[in-house]
Design a protein with these regions (language model features):
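Conserved active-site alpha-helix within GNAT-family acetyltransferase domains
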Residues: 72-96
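Conserved beta-hairpin
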Residues: 8-22
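Conserved acetyl-CoA-binding loop-helix of GNAT-fold acetyltransferases
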Residues: 46-60
């Protein structure tokens, strides 16, 4: 069972099993949908599939029907293997001050 505890940063939650900290997730919620914009796990847990377990825990809430994640391009195949569909009709664009 995963526990999501609010942090001092808006919409960011520390994720733990109660005794062990796993990382943190930032997400926005609208109606019955969640959009995760940042998911970080503790470095020593990399390669253990913790990211998809955290997202599955969010999706398992009875009032959530859909979860989306903003992912770096190099992690797209990881999330596709976890059951996510890549929707290539959207792309994040960034503009910085000159």
């Amino acid at each position: 069972r995963m526990v999501f505890e609010p942090t001092s940063q808006d919409q960011t939650f520390t994720v733990s099993t109660g005794a062990q900290r796993l990382g943190y997730v930032t997400y926005h919620r609208k109606d019955r949908s969640i959009v995760a914009t940042n998911l970080q796990i503790e470095p020593y847990l990399e390669g253990l599939d913790i990211e998809s377990q955290i997202l599955d825990a969010l999706l398992s809430h009875e009032d959530v029907e859909q979860i989306q994640i903003l992912s770096p391009i190099n992690l797209i195949s990881y999330y596709e293997e976890a059951g996510f569909e890549c929707q290539t009709k959207h792309i994040l664009l960034t503009k910085k001050k000159s």
